């Protein structure tokens, strides 16, 4: 599965080579995807190369070859200037603006239960794009939420198992952009990928810490990470 940014870059390179026969420059790619620096382009190209979508040709400047396109090739994913992805975004279709989670809706006369929208999936592992589904709500105890706006995400991965969060669980998130050290947060990395991790500070940098010794703590500059909310509850279904 490619992230939206990876798909946008792949299609931009593909279309440019169809038009001119020459791959775009790193500056052109950076501008087309509205990234702040070329380092983000280097990371995207490396990811595409590792997944077998492109190949770098040796001993030639700006030499890239598109080997294949995604099975669900969608020209609408060509990058548009000014596109700003959110932590919740569509998978392969045209991106849709995502409204802030609506105020919780009581679902019982006694007010003991609240309906919360399930907004998609979140990685507890290597970051992936969260995928907006928003096809259903879940009902949670009102005392789980407290004040503020909330949404739910389905967990994919095992990097938070020592915190009691398992693959397939549903986490309840209080919407917000700040966190304290030790909070488990939804973190958006490089405006592209979302992950569920414990928030730490390492000097001026931000550390996203797993709760599984098989995963390394990842360190980022403060401008590369945006907090999208904090964990306040968890729901597990037993089948």
From Swiss-Prot:
The record marks 124-125 as: Cleavage. Keywords: Autocatalytic cleavage, DNA damage, DNA repair, DNA replication, DNA-binding, Hydrolase, Repressor, SOS response, Transcription, Transcription regulation. One of its GO terms (biological process) is negative regulation of DNA-templated transcription. Gene3D superfamilies: Umud Fragment, subunit A (2.10.109.10), Winged helix-like DNA-binding domain superfamily/Winged helix DNA-binding domain (1.10.10.10). Coiled coil: none annotated. InterPro entries: LexA, LexA-like, LexA/Signal_pep-like_sf, LexA_DNA-bd_dom, LexA_repressor, Peptidase_S24_LexA, Peptidase_S24_S26A/B/C, WH-like_DNA-bd_sf. Residues 26-46 bind DNA. The keyword Endoplasmic reticulum does not apply. It catalyses: Hydrolysis of Ala-|-Gly bond in repressor LexA. Pfam families: LexA_DNA_bind (PF01726), Peptidase_S24 (PF00717). Its EC number is 3.4.21.88. SUPFAM superfamilies: LexA/Signal peptidase, Winged helix' DNA-binding domain. GO terms for molecular function: DNA binding; serine-type endopeptidase activity. The active site is at residues 159, 197. The keyword Cell membrane does not apply. PANTHER family: LEXA REPRESSOR, LEXA REPRESSOR-RELATED. Belongs to the peptidase S24 family. Represses a number of genes involved in the response to DNA damage (SOS response), including recA and lexA. In the presence of single-stranded DNA, RecA interacts with LexA causing an autocatalytic cleavage which disrupts the DNA-binding part of LexA, leading to derepression of the SOS regulon and eventually DNA repair. Homodimer. This is LexA repressor. It comes from Rhizobium etli (strain ATCC 51251 / DSM 11541 / JCM 21823 / NBRC 15573 / CFN 42).
């Amino acid at each position: 599965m490619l992230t939206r940014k990876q798909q946008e870059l792949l299609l931009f390179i593909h279309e440019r080579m169809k038009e001119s026969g020459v791959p775009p420059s790193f500056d052109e790619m950076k501008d087309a995807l509205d990234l702040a620096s070329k380092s983000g382009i280097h990371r995207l190209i490396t990811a595409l190369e590792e997944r077998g979508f492109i190949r770098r040709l040796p001993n030639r400047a700006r030499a890239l070859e598109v080997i294949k396109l995604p099975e669900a090739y969608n020209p609408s994913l060509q990058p548009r200037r000014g596109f700003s992805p959110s932590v919740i975004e569509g998978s392969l279709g045209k991106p849709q603006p995502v409204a802030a989670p609506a105020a919780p809706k009581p679902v019982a006369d006694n007010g003991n239960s609240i309906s919360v929208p399930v907004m998609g999936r979140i990685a507890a592992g290597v970051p992936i794009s969260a995928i907006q589904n928003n096809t259903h709500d879940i009902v949670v105890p009102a005392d789980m939420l407290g004040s503020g706006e909330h949404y739910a995400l389905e967990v994919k991965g095992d990097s938070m198992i020592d915190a009691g969060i398992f693959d397939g669980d549903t986490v309840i998130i209080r919407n917000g952009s700040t966190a304290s050290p030790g909070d488990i947060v939804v973190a958006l990395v490089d405006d592209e990928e979302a992950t569920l991790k414990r928030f730490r500070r390492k000097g001026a940098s931000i550390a996203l810490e797993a709760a599984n010794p098989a995963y390394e703590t990842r360190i980022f500059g403060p401008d590369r990470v945006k907090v999208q909310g904090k964990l306040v509850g968890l729901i597990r279904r037993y089948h």
